[in-house]
Amino acid sequence: YHAGGSGYPVLAKAPLSVTDVAASLEAAASVPAGGTIEVKWTGPNDQGDFVSIDPAGAPDRTYGNYGYPAKGNPLALKAPDAAGDYVLRYHLGDSYRVLASRPLRVGAVGATLEFPAQANAGGTLAVRWTGPGREGDFISLDAAGAGEQTYGNYAYPEAAGRPAEIRVPDEPGDYVVRYHLASSYGVIGSAPLTVEAVTASLTAPAQV
């Protein structure tokens, strides 16, 4: 206890022992890219504590997708879209110090897309697909050579076995149909498409 005034003199004191805290994490060893993994945890569950999926070898203050233990046990976390080696970690909220960790393998996922090689401009393209079919995933009809974050007309793969119907652009040319993951727009399947021009003719009497 410090008194006010010059020098803040100590008027009273008592010993204090600070004990360390611990945590543990239990989860599957692997998860598909973009999937959800359930993590059972033990730990202090203090305000701001969080459990994260981080790149292998990342420092304590570097973290990826995360959730708060207070949200539940087990805690559901979304895996990254990029396959590779990661680590699950329990961080203290105030210092980000890691109390517990365990390795996690994020496996690659793929998709297939089937449709006619040509389509008429302005028409509708029915795309049969296989893939994760997660909420927010989408199938797009894009300009050939477009970046993953650039997409054109699209549809959601709503139900397995039901083709996704996408409106074909009005401009003929070379395009690509792509399956994008929801969170990163990462492409896990693609196939080329040629959009062909359509013509029309009119016949009528010369005068009425």
Model-derived features: where do they sit?
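Extended, solvent-exposed regions of the mature portions of secreted/cell-surface glycoproteins
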Residues: 1-208
